[in-house]
């Protein structure tokens, strides 16, 4: 039976034992990758500066997912929030990684067992002795078990009843920590940025899954529906499973890219929309204005801005600035952030405060334009000096820093003023170390961007897979010439193979 390479998976089509085996082996590979990747990331992760060099700047991918579920400590003696730990306990980052690797090994052995012992009695019909699977019953069992897991996660892990809780932070990603979360049963639970919705939705969805599972275990599908949806065909299971997976992938791509309580900015980095909308800039100005209203000086007001908040307001942390094929972490792009230089305030010779127009997300270069409080252009860095009217030299622009390392320092030299005006296009100004990692100065995306791109791409691919396999099972008689009501099953690898002349096409 010469199967082409793209149809080799049909060998498990009517072999439940080996179908289970290959799925267990797949689980072993996934769990093994997760544990190994976690150990690799822990080997290269630098926990020394959680403010200016957080996990998402270092390109960590699996550490943020462990952290949002309540893991914060390492056997190396450090905590993700900074400081040292004396007793991290079993469920540290390394402990979780090790558990995944051990689970992977057990799955590997189980896969081998099921491959060798494939012809089990449980796969045979008691009445006829022929191979058969009660797929609606199996669906009910799986739905019930997944409902129990979903309910347990929401009712115990997230709420802290039996578990650590989840990562919760303020709207500006400054005070994040792992804590128990109470379910939000009101309308606020539908706000994607309310952590309580995670608990309540898992409890509700889990309850629904348990009830639906019990329903499918106790109620048989009508014959017309069973035949119409080909419920006796394992490819129907494949098609509907792919549908569930691609739907979930589309959903999480959205919650990651647009932001939600499940994707905190402290763990995955800010979203592009927070730059586009000046989200952090507005909060910084609000805090400064409040300080000035309390009779603080500019220097005092700006010095009270958390460095963490200022760092979010920097275009280099925008996940949409990274090119699609630029490999590496953000630190490999613009460098490792060392310190905030402070907020530059530009003034012309008449004393007007000027604001540098910020670079939009999808621009690589952008003209340096300084406007006043009314939006009128007062200064720029001209492309052609011969025709300039608003150059820094002509307008007499100066810059003074408030807060940060250059607090109180002012410059009137045009070359220096223009240098900081160019850098102010990119948000708050930071000193960046490019030497340590040989950073090339080209922006990279954060794990938020990678996750979104990967899941959106695979969701699209799996959508077509759902259409393909759904069509194959619904129109099997048209595509393969096989009677859709044919329920005869023979040994694995020798039945229902397109292109195989030995496949029976009609029931006797």
UniProtKB/Swiss-Prot annotation:
Question: Which family does this protein fall into?
Answer: Belongs to the PsbB/PsbC family. PsbB subfamily.
Note the superkingdom of the native organism: Eukaryota
Name under which the protein is recorded? Photosystem II CP47 reaction center protein
Q: How is the cofactor bound?
A: Binds multiple chlorophylls. PSII binds additional chlorophylls, carotenoids and specific lipids.
Role of this protein: One of the components of the core complex of photosystem II (PSII). It binds chlorophyll and helps catalyze the primary light-induced photochemical processes of PSII. PSII is a light-driven water:plastoquinone oxidoreductase, using light energy to abstract electrons from H(2)O, generating O(2) and a proton gradient subsequently used for ATP formation.
For this UniProt record, give its keywords in alphabetical order, as a comma-separated list.
Chlorophyll, Chloroplast, Chromophore, Membrane, Photosynthesis, Photosystem II, Plastid, Thylakoid, Transmembrane, Transmembrane helix
- GO BP terms in the entry: photosynthetic electron transport in photosystem II
GO MF terms held by the record: chlorophyll binding; electron transporter, transferring electrons within the cyclic electron transport pathway of photosynthesis activity
The terms describing its cellular component in GO are: chloroplast thylakoid membrane; photosystem II
According to the record's subunit comment, the protein's assembly and interactions are: PSII is composed of 1 copy each of membrane proteins PsbA, PsbB, PsbC, PsbD, PsbE, PsbF, PsbH, PsbI, PsbJ, PsbK, PsbL, PsbM, PsbT, PsbX, PsbY, PsbZ, Psb30/Ycf12, at least 3 peripheral proteins of the oxygen-evolving complex and a large number of cofactors. It forms dimeric complexes.
Answer yes or no on keyword Transmembrane helix. Answer: yes
Tell me which Gene3D superfamilies the record gives. Photosystem II CP47 reaction center protein (3.10.680.10)
Annotated localization: Plastid, Chloroplast thylakoid membrane
Q: Which residues form the signal peptide?
A: none
Q: Which residues carry this modification: Aspartyl aldehyde?
A: 348
Q: Name one Pfam family in it.
A: PSII
How the protein sits in the membrane?
Answer: Multi-pass membrane protein
> What residue ranges are annotated as transmembrane?
21-36, 101-115, 140-156, 203-218, 237-252, 457-472
